[in-house]
């Protein structure tokens, strides 16, 4: 899977000032006669009235106003505007920047490289201080955090540039991408989806490291960078990352301490989804990780080391997951101490353990909302999508009180599984791992994607006809009490 930075989603703002009728003005210093002034004023009034009528009409006809495009936070947005408009935007968020901004930053240092250069001496140093200096210069009034005062998060994902070999693979990747766009929009997360190879020798699963590293430099205002494999689905649109839980850590991976540090099992964690802090420790860690990959002259040797060291590893290929287990277990004090192995919820759930439970989980949530209580009635109220997080918190409280079992979204928890990862299904390649059938993968992916999509469509008054159907039906008023 290749991943790299794509061109940003561009929005051209209309130019302000310059042309148009702003009032009758005499040219070349000559005074206009009174009649011409009167005519010009009448013309100006008529033009303004016409513009107002046009804008009013457009507000009804346009399915997506320009303001929504500019505010669309799930993709990077490029806004072309006049200096006056830019100044207004910058003043609103407390930013000082642009091509003519005063003060040099790390961007002006030719020694700072976006690329992963295995074997190159030096690398980026002093990143924490460099990033802090950039923040002070560009956000003199302090960085405005995202909704609810959370630290800023940039999600990075990606797929290969050429078309998929597997039938329907491109369509599935599109649906996986839509799922990520939906989640990011609901939670104020910026999404960077990439399909170019940043380091030609770091192929397949190794391509994530150059993409994440480049994202750190491109987004110094982000505290966290969140890698999510293309074939991972957000199956709980209500859940937000518990960032406070990781305040003393720099890397979050789904895994088990006993299997990583005790048994040194190569499947003691999964590297398909991880959260990494934007700091010097992380840059150093990714440099060490990359040195075990295919861009390193020591790649073959590392394959033998991992085969001989890690329990259960049958091949001599140095893959990203085995390398991660090795780094954490071999250098526990240096790398492991700042890594949080998350098992309290499905930071990424194995799809085989998840998909057959989704129908029961959906029924559990609906039952909680059908209860004859004022709280359940409030949850059934139709509301704007912008209010999603408040309703999500109330819904989780209602389900938690109605369903026995621990929280977390694991096999015995009451919560929906947060992320369902279709490891081994290879939707783009077309040939899944031999232990899975094509039908089980296809049905599982459709079921998980529709399960997630129903949570989004509810804000628009619809849901899928059934778990495997693309057809949608309108929801009755007071759903799910009325069905």
Curated annotation (Swiss-Prot):
It holds the Pfam family Glyco_transf_34. One of its GO terms (molecular function) is galactosyltransferase activity. It is found in: Golgi apparatus membrane. Residues 62-483 are lumenal. Its EC number is 2.4.-.-. It is an enzyme of class 2 (transferase). It is a single-pass type II membrane protein. The keyword Membrane applies. Residues 1-40 are cytoplasmic. Induction: Down-regulated by treatment with atrazine. PANTHER family: GLYCOSYLTRANSFERASE 6-RELATED, XYLOGLUCAN 6-XYLOSYLTRANSFERASE 5-RELATED-RELATED. This is Probable glycosyltransferase 6.
């Amino acid at each position: 899977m290749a991943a790299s930075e794509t061109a940003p989603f561009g929005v051209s703002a209309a130019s302000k000032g310059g042309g148009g009728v702003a009032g009758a003005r005499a040219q070349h210093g000559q005074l206009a006669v009174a009649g011409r002034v009167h005519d010009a004023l009448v013309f100006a009034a008529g033009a303004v009235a016409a513009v107002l009528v046009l804008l009013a009409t457009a507000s009804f006809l346009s399915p997506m106003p320009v303001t929504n495009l500019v505010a669309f936070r799930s993709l990077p947005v490029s806004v072309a505007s006049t200096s006056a408009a830019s100044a207004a935007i910058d003043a609103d968020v407390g930013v000082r920047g642009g091509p003519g901004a005063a003060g040099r930053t790390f961007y002006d240092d030719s020694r700072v490289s976006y690329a992963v250069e295995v074997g190159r001496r030096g690398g980026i140093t002093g990143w924490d201080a460099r990033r802090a200096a950039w923040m002070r210069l560009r956000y003199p009034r302090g960085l405005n955090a995202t909704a609810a005062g959370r630290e800023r998060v940039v999600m990075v994902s990606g797929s290969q540039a050429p078309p998929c070999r597997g039938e329907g693979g491109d369509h599935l990747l599109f649906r996986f991408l839509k799922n990520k766009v939906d989640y990011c929009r609901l939670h104020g997360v910026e999404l960077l989806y990439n399909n170019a190879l940043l380091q030609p020798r770091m192929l397949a699963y190794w391509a994530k490291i150059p993409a994440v590293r480049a994202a750190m430099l491109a987004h110094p205002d982000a505290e966290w960078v969140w890698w999510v494999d293309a074939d991972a689905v957000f199956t709980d649109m209500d859940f937000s990352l518990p960032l406070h839980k990781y305040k003393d850590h720099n890397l979050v991976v789904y895994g088990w301490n006993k299997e990583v540090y005790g048994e040194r099992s190569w499947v003691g964690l999964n590297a398909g989804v991880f959260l990494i802090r934007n700091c010097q420790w992380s840059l150093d860690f990714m440099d060490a990780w990359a040195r075990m990959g295919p861009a390193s002259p020591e790649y073959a040797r590392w394959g033998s080391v991992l085969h001989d060291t890690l329990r259960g590893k049958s091949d001599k290929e140095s893959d990203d997951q085995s390398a991660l287990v090795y780094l954490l277990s071999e250098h526990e004090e240096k790398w492991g101490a700042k890594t949080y192995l998350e098992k309290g919820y499905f930071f990424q759930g194995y799809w085989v353990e998840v998909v057959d439970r989704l129908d029961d989980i959906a029924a559990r949530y609906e039952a909680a909302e059908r209860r004859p209580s004022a709280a359940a009635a409030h949850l059934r109220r139709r509301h704007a999508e912008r209010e999603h997080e408040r309703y999500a918190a109330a819904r989780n409280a209602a389900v938690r009180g109605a369903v026995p079992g621990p929280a977390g979204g694991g096999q015995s928890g009451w919560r929906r599984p947060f992320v369902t990862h279709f490891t081994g299904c290879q939707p783009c390649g077309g040939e899944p791992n031999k232990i899975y059938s094509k039908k089980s993968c296809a049905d599982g992916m459709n079921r998980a994607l529709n399960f997630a999509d129903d949570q989004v469509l509810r804000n628009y008054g619809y849901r899928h006809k059934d778990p495997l159907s693309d057809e949608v039906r309108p929801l009755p008023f007071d759903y799910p009490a009325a069905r």
